Structures are given as structure tokens and as C-alpha cells.
């Protein structure tokens, strides 16, 4: 089974309507993919597809796909400036006298586009200059209907609230990236362990789901593109995604922390009966995560139990009823590109689409596999074709994968938060890898010369003993 992951581990080197205008510069757009959307076109043509008119509005799928992928070729603030300029130019909004009938048909479409953009990609509007573009273009149509100005005020208010929530972020992982070294096992009477905080597997699975959804909520769709797709070589602008993946990185750290927390909780008890009890508890938690649709926590728990310091505890595992664990391992088996997991994920996705309750809507994918799928999609297809056109067909597939994730992450968690449990999950000390090995050797003595030598080295370096 996979071990814990870092962002570098995840990535190794190696229905739409046409706008009313024709392709520019005499170009011929590629063959349509869906209802008039070109499979490839110049960036200018794709931008034109985004711009509404009095008689045309781009379909929602096109808006999301282009706004997601366009940042590979043009920075969002520049794209917004271009869109606003085209709106002003095409609708003649710079004239002293406006065609009010025409503007009244165009205005709602412009506001709808801006609403969709700010709702889905709020981080594109963090700079004051982008807000200035919004106010300028809406200010030009406001004389035709004061409702436009009111709608703009509501839009900006919602945007500011969204940005404020994103800046606040989820609860931090205190010390998550700095595991402690093993010193000595504290007496059971004073050691605070997870089972002392929560002894019910279903409750812990619910709280893990609460944590997962809270952290997922802060990941913007643009982070997938910014983190895992190379900068377009034909673009003249500087890379626009160097430091814009903090929420994605934090989510990877959370997965790693949960792996190490599981291993730490198993290795900590002094008696094998207690260790076996903890293992069986986590097996039940993992099963409940599977039933809920929380595959990310499920994989983290399985990965933690499969870490070498845990898996070597043969005397402990001999006391564990492992039938349920083997079933879960089979579900998450990487064989066949995780075919068993992918089948289960499709089942959970179907359940979510037909859900009658909020609990049935939950789908939390195994995140690192989602990232790898997106990465290999990018690696397998060029961003541009030999003629310089943008490979829009590729980005439709990218948007399909990211869009599904966005739908899942927007589900409201139906479980009430238990602050004491989530605080423990975030802050409980975890062993480093060396600490886990030492705790494991202290629990069950080394069985071969290699283990004996490692145990001796760890006792010397960590405990100062020979």
C-alpha cells in the first residue's frame, strides 16, 4: 500500500454555443466538440467565446473550462481586463449616448458572467485592480438601469465575504510537519490517547469527514492547474502560480499527519493487547469511512497501519481479527490502477447524484490519486497544437475531473463537530519515522540482525543509550 505523500511525490518530472463573431486573423477553428465548441482555437477566439453580447451568453460548462485553463496562457487579471475591454468595445459603452434597449439585454448577461467568475474563482479578484475593472464596466451600463449597480454591490459583498473566509483558512495542523522523536513511553495512567477522547468508530469517522470537508472547502479549482501544469512556453507573462497552492499542500500534509497519527496510536501502548485493541478500533473507523464515502481518510488509516513499524508487530497482529481489514485493503488495492477503488468511487458518486439526504451526498476521493490522474492527463496531451492553437479538447477533460471534485467539496457536512475530537486530530503529538521504529522495537524486540542494529542506533541517537 502507498506510504505517506508529499507534493513532490505526487508529481514526478518526467455543452457550448458559439459567439456571434467569426475567428480572428482568418483562422479556422478546430472541429466542434460539443454544440459548437471548437476542439482547438486561438486564445483570442476562446476569449471571444467567453464575452457575452445582447443575444449570446456562453454556457456554464464553457465558462468553467476556459476560466480554469486560461491561466496557463494569460493571467486572470489580464483576462478580465481583455473581457471588459471587449464588452465596452462591442456594446459601444464608451459612447456619450448608449443604446438603452441593447444595453438592457446585455447588462444581465454581463452581471451573470461576473457572478459566475467571482463565485467559482474568487482568488482571481484579490487585487484592487481587478475590482476596478468590475466597477468600471458595470458603472458604464448602470445609467440604463440602476438595478445593475445594486446587483454589483451584492456581488462585491459576496466576493469580499468569500475572500475573507478563504484568508481565514481551516484550523492549522499544529506541529503536523514536525513529528516528535520517541523518548520514553509515558505511563498509561497519564498518557492521553485517541481512544480516551473518542471510543466510538462511527463518531470518529464522522469527525474525520468533518475535517476532510473543512480542508477541501478551501482548495480552489485553480490550484490543480497552478500546481501540476507547466507554464505555457508561448506566454509572455511570468508564471502566475508559484505560491498559490497552499491549501492543496496543506491537504497533503493532513493526509500524512493522519497516517502518522494512526501509526503512533498503535505503537504507543506498552501491552500488545492494548495495541491490538487500537488496531481493531482503526479497522472499524476505516470501515465507517468507507460506508460514509470518505475514501481519503480510509486510505490514510490503511496506509498508517501498513507502515513498517506497525506491520512488523507480528505478536500484536496475531491478536487482531483481520478479516475486515483484508476486505478494506482489497477495496483500496493499487492493482489495476486502483480498479476496485475506482468502482467504489463511481458507486459513491452515483449515490451522491441520487441522494435523498445530505449524508448520502458525501464523496471524498483518495486525493493523491486524483492529483496523479490530473497530472498524467496533462503529461499525455499538449496544451497547444503544432499550429499554436489551444488544445481545448484537453481542457474539457481537465474541467470534467476538477468540476466533479468541486461538486463534492461543496457538500455541507451533516455531522456536528466535536471540538475535543477534531482538536486532538489536529494537535496530538505524532512520532517521526525513527520514533515509530524505536517504539515498535521497544514493544516487540527486533527479530533479525538488521533490526537489532537499527534498534541499537536509534536507542543511541534518540535515547542516548547503548
UniProtKB/Swiss-Prot annotation:
One of its GO terms (molecular function) is guanyl-nucleotide exchange factor activity. Disulfide bonds: none annotated. SMART domains: RasGEF (SM00147). Residues 200-446 form the Ras-GEF domain. One of its GO terms (biological process) is Ras protein signal transduction. InterPro entries: Ras-like_GEF, Ras-like_Gua-exchang_fac_N, Ras_G-nucl-exch_fac_CS, Ras_GEF_dom_sf, RASGEF_cat_dom, RASGEF_cat_dom_sf. Residues 34-164 form the N-terminal Ras-GEF domain. It comes from the Eukaryota. GO terms for cellular component: plasma membrane. The keyword Chloroplast does not apply. This is Ras-GEF domain-containing family member 1C. It comes from Homo sapiens. The lineage of its organism: Eukaryota, Metazoa, Chordata, Craniata, Vertebrata.
Amino acid at each position: 500500500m502507498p506510504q505517506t505523500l508529499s507534493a513532490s511525490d505526487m508529481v514526478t518530472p518526467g455543452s457550448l454555443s458559439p459567439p456571434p463573431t467569426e475567428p480572428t486573423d482568418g483562422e479556422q477553428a478546430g472541429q466542434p466538440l460539443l454544440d459548437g465548441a471548437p476542439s482547438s482555437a486561438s486564445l483570442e477566439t476562446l476569449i471571444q467565446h467567453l464575452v457575452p453580447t445582447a443575444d449570446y451568453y456562453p454556457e456554464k460548462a464553457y465558462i468553467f473550462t476556459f476560466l480554469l485553463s486560461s491561466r496557463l496562457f494569460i493571467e486572470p487579471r489580464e483576462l478580465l481586463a481583455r473581457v471588459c475591454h471587449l464588452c465596452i468595445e462591442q456594446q459601444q459603452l464608451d459612447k456619450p449616448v448608449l443604446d438603452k434597449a441593447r444595453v438592457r439585454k446585455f447588462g444581465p448577461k454581463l452581471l451573470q458572467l461576473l457572478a459566475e467568475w467571482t463565485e467559482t474563482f474568487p482568488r482571481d479578484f484579490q487585487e484592487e485592480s481587478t475590482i476596478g475593472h468590475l466597477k468600471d464596466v458595470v458603472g458604464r451600463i448602470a445609467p440604463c438601469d440602476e438595478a445593475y449597480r445594486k446587483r454589483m454591490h451584492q456581488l462585491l459583498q459576496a466576493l469580499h465575504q468569500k475572500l475573507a473566509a478563504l484568508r481565514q483558512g481551516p484550523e492549522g495542523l499544529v506541529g503536523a510537519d514536525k513529528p516528535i522523536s520517541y523518548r520514553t513511553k509515558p505511563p498509561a495512567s497519564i498518557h492521553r490517547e485517541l481512544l480516551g477522547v473518542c471510543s466510538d468508530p462511527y463518531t470518529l469517522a464522522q469527525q474525520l469527514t468533518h475535517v476532510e470537508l473543512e480542508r477541501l472547502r478551501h482548495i480552489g479549482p485553480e490550484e490543480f492547474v497552478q500546481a501540476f501544469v507547466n507554464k505555457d512556453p508561448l506566454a509572455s507573462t511570468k508564471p502566475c502560480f508559484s505560491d498559490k497552492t497552499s491549501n492543496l499542500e496543506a491537504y497533503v500534509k493532513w493526509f500524512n499527519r493522519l497516517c502518522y497519527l494512526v501509526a503512533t496510536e498503535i505503537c504507543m501502548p506498552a501491552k500488545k493487547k492494548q495495541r491490538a485493541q487500537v488496531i481493531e478500533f482503526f479497522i472499524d473507523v476505516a470501515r465507517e469511512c468507507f460506508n460514509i464515502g470518505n475514501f481519503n481518510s480510509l486510505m490514510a488509516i490503511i496506509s498508517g497501519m501498513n507502515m513498517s513499524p506497525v506491520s512488523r508487530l507480528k505478536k500484536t497482529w496475531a491478536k487482531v481479527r483481520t478479516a475486515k481489514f483484508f476486505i478494506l485493503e482489497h477495496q483500496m488495492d493499487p492493482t489495476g490502477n486502483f480498479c476496485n477503488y475506482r468502482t467504489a468511487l463511481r458507486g459513491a458518486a452515483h449515490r451522491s447524484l441520487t441522494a435523498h439526504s445530505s449524508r448520502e451526498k458525501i464523496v471524498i476521493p483518495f486525493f493523491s490519486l486524483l492529483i496523479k490522474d490530473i497530472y498524467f492527463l496533462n503529461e499525455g496531451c499538449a496544451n497547444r497544437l503544432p499550429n499554436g492553437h489551444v488544445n481545448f479538447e484537453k481542457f474539457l477533460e481537465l474541467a470534467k475531473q476538477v468540476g466533479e471534485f468541486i461538486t463534492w467539496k461543496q457538500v455541507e457536512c451533516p455531522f456536528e463537530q466535536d471540538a475535543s475530537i477534531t482538536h486532538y486530530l489536529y494537535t496530538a503529538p505524532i512520532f517521526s519515522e525513527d520514533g515509530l521504529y524505536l517504539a515498535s522495537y521497544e514493544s516487540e524486540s527486533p527479530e533479525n540482525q538488521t533490526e537489532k542494529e537499527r534498534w541499537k542506533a536509534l536507542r543511541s541517537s534518540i535515547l542516548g543509550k547503548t
